[in-house]
């Protein structure tokens, strides 16, 4: 089970940190792009050079690596090499895919995710089919982490202010996570995500559910909110991978997180 892998590696690495891999090219955005030193004439080599170096630099202080599909479209061979490097460094590999489709299409995605040897992936429940996807994923030894209350400001409109069966959408989703036995929730730590929301999600999902926590860094997420979570996995992205010294930066964040995590989780 993904939960067991998380516990083992978190203990081995003494870490609850996940690193997001979002390797942006200059034409994709104006700031936070791959530094010049990684560039090659071949875009594939550029993406791979950057990704592998970041993985190696942060590996001492991280539990997992989460490449975002949107930055690797058309490059499954790169993702396979990334996963191998992640596993070689003793970490978990999570595909940030936000899968959301009908059963047959989801099944096709699971085939490729498994073939690339990922340990888990993110799933968007908006289209439904959560139960079937979780069952099929577990049959393939894949973990499913469900978008529950995301960190971006627009998420408040859909996930907090929108109701399903008389309750906030995020709480409805948390109940779905418990009912379907999904492995985790994606939950934000940004300003609109109140402590009470996180407590409600934790209470609803129950034990053995991993919280992939987002928003610390440029989004202004609050690290102290992880105190409300039993099994946190804190995502860091731009603040680390585009820093001058990713290894030193991720170590700094680890020291910060230790203040808000139980001694048993981070000693």
Segment roles from a protein language model:
Residues 224-231, 235-267:
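C-terminal helical cap(s) of enzyme catalytic domains, especially alpha/beta-barrels
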Residues 71-85, 102-108, 125-142, 190-204, ...:
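Active-site-adjacent beta->alpha loops and helix N-cap segments on the catalytic face
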Residues 13-17, 60-63, 89-92, 118-119, ...:
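Short, well-ordered coil/turn segments that N-cap beta-strands
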Residues 1-81, 85-88, 92, 165, ...:
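Conserved N-terminal beta1-alpha1 strand-loop-helix module at the mouth
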Residues 185, 190-235, 239-240:
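A C-terminal functional module that forms or caps the active site or interfaces directly
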Residues 47-54, 58-66, 187-199, 213, ...:
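Conserved alpha/beta-domain cores
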Residues 24-39, 101-189, 208:
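Conserved anion-binding
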Residues 19, 65, 96, 121, ...:
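Conserved, mostly hydrophobic/aromatic
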């Amino acid at each position: 089970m993904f939960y067991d892998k998380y516990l083992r590696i978190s203990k081995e690495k003494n870490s609850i940190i996940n690193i997001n891999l979002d390797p942006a090219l200059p034409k994709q955005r104006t700031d936070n792009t791959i530094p010049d030193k990684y560039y090659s004439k071949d875009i594939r080599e550029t993406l791979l050079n950057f990704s592998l170096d970041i993985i190696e630099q942060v590996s001492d202080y991280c539990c997992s690596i989460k490449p975002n599909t949107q930055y690797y479209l058309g490059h499954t061979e790169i993702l396979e090499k990334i996963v191998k490097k992640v596993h070689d460094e003793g970490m978990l590999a999570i595909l940030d895919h936000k899968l959301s489709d009908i059963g047959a299409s989801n099944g096709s995605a699971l085939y490729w995710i498994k073939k690339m040897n990922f340990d888990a992936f993110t799933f968007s429940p908006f289209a439904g089919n959560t139960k079937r996807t979780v069952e099929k994923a577990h049959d393939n030894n894949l973990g499913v982490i469900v978008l529950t209350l995301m960190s971006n400001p627009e998420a408040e409109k859909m996930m907090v202010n929108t109701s399903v069966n008389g309750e906030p959408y995020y709480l409805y989703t948390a109940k779905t996570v418990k009912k379907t036995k999904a492995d985790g929730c994606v939950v934000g730590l940004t300003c609109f995500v109140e402590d009470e929301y996180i407590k409600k999600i934790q209470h609803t999902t129950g034990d053995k559910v991993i919280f992939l926590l987002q928003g610390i860094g440029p989004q202004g997420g609050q690290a102290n909110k992880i105190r409300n979570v039993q099994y946190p996995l804190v995502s860091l992205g731009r603040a680390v991978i585009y820093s001058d010294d990713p290894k030193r930066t991720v170590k700094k964040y680890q020291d910060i997180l230790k203040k808000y995590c139980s001694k048993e989780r981070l000693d």
